[in-house]
């Protein structure tokens, strides 16, 4: 994921990038705003460890003031190593106290992060949330149910929102299809459903072989299917990545826009994707290089002309 961002001009869509954490959340958000971003994502701590940085009340006030002054959507990404199902070999909440203790530790930090991000970005007409890879388990049915059971143990407050990200399907990874995401959602208790959203990653969905996003008609089918199975009101964020991995490879390999298998030949379907996201109020976050923001700025200029 990219670290440093040059100042850019104007992008007509609600797009930003994953950014490095700049000492405090307010500095991190401000760095994105000054680069012309309308959305950002960051790690509130190590991407490979569960201890999250604490955010002071002073910081909460500063960030909320920025959100009220500028059109910015705020997201964080929970550590890659999280697994709400427990582990590949041992389910949580299935009589293994050691595994349950580990999962409880993950949930404690996740609960803090999802509630603090909800406070930071929970401003009217702005989207926010914590993106998470739901988990892995060898028995898909049991794994999906256990993920929902873990979510049910979280005490959500206010505008807190947890975003389930689709996976590319490698190994025992879960949430590969809309149906699997819906199965998790359906098993979340009703009172907590409003705190659950979805993050769709274009590289993952292409790598799994669900939709060939290089084709315009597949973009429309993607939106139609999501609306039919889950509901577009639950689609909170788009991870906008090209794919180094071929279609249906079950591999997660991000590429810069125009440098992969999806948009290496043309950007026509990308324009359709961005247009539909704008129509439905879905912000997008890039996870590769700063140059992608320039690609989108240029693409927007050409589209206007």
Regions found by a protein language model. Give the residues of each.
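Gly/Pro-rich active-site loop or hairpin
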Residues: 53, 89, 93-104, 141, ...
